[in-house]
């Protein structure tokens, strides 16, 4: 099925990558999807043979046209309007999930291909020798691989995953479905209390394996239910872009403290000059590369360097930082659509260098 063509101001445009290729996929097809970067368009005449093509390089003319389009809509809204969108951000997301409930996004089975760290074949239990080696590498820092804080959800787990911005569970439930490891525990949080209520009301929600909670990752005073240095993986899928740019660094710093030494942060988000950015009309710009959608939710479009600076400043080292330039095709209408996403893996440094 080809990717839909919808109005530029619709949140569907911004959220089309929920299947990573833009086309709707059933679960079996999604799990078989090859990793990004394996389907290349070598003959432009064959563009309509598939729904999507990987690593499509832009011409200088395309880059120039994209920059011009962004500059045309670069006049920011008045400060009082920006403050309103910031103060009412949770209301807009609650309204979004009240309207759409669990019908808007597809389950993200493609994540197991792009991020094998989430796949069930991963070995989550550290051997005694590896644990001893990691503790030695901490050079005497007051950090334990098994935090001895008061009891917390998932305290007995051997492998802990946190998804920030979980929505209605389109990442969490595929993880729980496919991973029967008794040592696995998944945390998930969202800014929207409506979204978290929908997660908890899902028949597949199991409090013995999962803990859902409301949390604003940009709130410095907000508490997480797990202690620092307790998480193996943190997942950020199209969520960091919803924050005000000035709040991003402190939010990542806080998440970094939750990771165990050697733990990883996985991100996929909107890239600079993505089709969604170029389709914004005048009167939607909040600040440079930061916009408000018609429903009041906000979105930022990143470069690789911006994300690298955010993560490295939080003490994380790069494992992967790539641009996914995807040419999506609507074969029925003979249309081409250029998507740009950034995908990152960053690891918490084991010891000071």
Swiss-Prot record:
Pfam families in the cross-refs: Methyltransf_12
Keyword Repressor among record annotations: no
Record's subcellular location: Cytoplasm
Protein name stated in the entry: tRNA N(3)-cytidine methyltransferase METTL2
Main location: cytoplasm
This protein's GO CC annotations: cytoplasm
GO MF annotation terms: tRNA (cytidine) methyltransferase activity; tRNA (cytidine-3-)-methyltransferase activity
The keyword Transcription regulation belongs to this UniProt entry's keyword annotation: no
EC number: 2.1.1.-
Keywords: Cytoplasm, Methyltransferase, S-adenosyl-L-methionine, Transferase, tRNA processing
Chain's gene name: mettl2a
BP-aspect Gene Ontology terms: tRNA methylation
Assembly notes: Monomer.
Family: Belongs to the methyltransferase superfamily. METL family.
Enzyme class per UniProt: transferase
Binding of S-adenosyl-L-methionine, residues: 93, 97, 165, 190, 216, 237
Annotated function: S-adenosyl-L-methionine-dependent methyltransferase that mediates N(3)-methylcytidine modification of residue 32 of the tRNA anticodon loop of tRNA(Thr)(UGU) and tRNA(Arg)(CCU). N(3)-methylcytidine methylation by mettl2a requires the N6-threonylcarbamoylation of tRNA (t6A37) by the EKC/KEOPS complex as prerequisite.
Region (Disordered): 1-37
The reaction(s) this protein catalyses: cytidine(32) in tRNA(Thr) + S-adenosyl-L-methionine = N(3)-methylcytidine(32) in tRNA(Thr) + S-adenosyl-L-homocysteine + H(+); cytidine(32) in tRNA(Arg)(CCU) + S-adenosyl-L-methionine = N(3)-methylcytidine(32) in tRNA(Arg)(CCU) + S-adenosyl-L-homocysteine + H(+)
